[in-house]
């Protein structure tokens, strides 16, 4: 088993020695990671770390196309998927029993695993449409909100309502929606995905697009109404941007079924968290997949294996009541 680390030498040696002595008898021989639709950041990022963990731990594993964070919470809660990815908003709704996939079911068997990145909310239109601001979006515009049950589909329609936009709702995978935008079947796509969003990057290659930022007033309204934070999409993210674009964002976390073996989850976390350069090679959004961002989780209980890793390697002060089983 290989564990690449960028931590202190003593931590590396201790971790490597412990890894060799781990009892793997109760580990699964294979696993899946619930991601989202093809063409989105979740699929690229999730498939990447799934393959990495499988390779490093000598298991069979990979990413699975899903409807995104809401469905991932359900899949991981039931154990149909060992791992998944979610944003803090859908996670909170799922714990409260308001996940639309299974209303009334409190999905408490999905535990926090590691921090991923922030998901900015951004709007894209064809340059030929003349839509350059949210206020330019015409009444009755056909807006693609991503896969049903995704973070974008859950929150962006409510955000558009808050900003006074009248629209016709459309759902689909990001790649498919990008094609519909290019073909004139959609007026706007409302993206909530880690940047750069593959579908947006692909659109930039094929046509001229406008990546629309929120005004200060629009951003303030969203910050007041939703569980989001201020975020700027860096101008270097897309060739279209000439300056940073004002946005809002939610944090994403990898999740694990709470009953998975502690040593298995701890080893998987080590593979992902111990080499950020390798993770950035999977997707640029992984620049935020850093151990110190463990504190961005204020919603989900931690898997005991993940909590142990962050306590040992990131000096994480995770309270006992935030660790599953305590």
Describe the function of each predicted region.
Residues 1-19:
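Gram-negative bacterial Sec-dependent N-terminal signal peptides
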Residues 20-93:
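N-terminal (or domain-start) structured segment
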Residues 28, 58, 68-71, 78, ...:
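Extracytoplasmic
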Residues 28-56, 60-61, 119-183, 292, ...:
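Bilobed "Venus flytrap"/periplasmic-binding protein-like clamshell domains
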Residues 28-29, 176, 182-183, 193, ...:
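An extracytoplasmic/periplasmic, membrane-proximal ligand-sensing/linker region
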Residues 88-90, 97-103, 129, 165-260:
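Pocket-lining segment of extracytoplasmic ligand-binding domains
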Residues 92-98, 109-115:
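Short beta-strand-centered segments that line the small-molecule binding cleft or hinge
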Residues 139-155, 227-298:
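Ligand-binding clefts/hinges and TM-proximal coupling segments of bilobed small-molecule sensing domains
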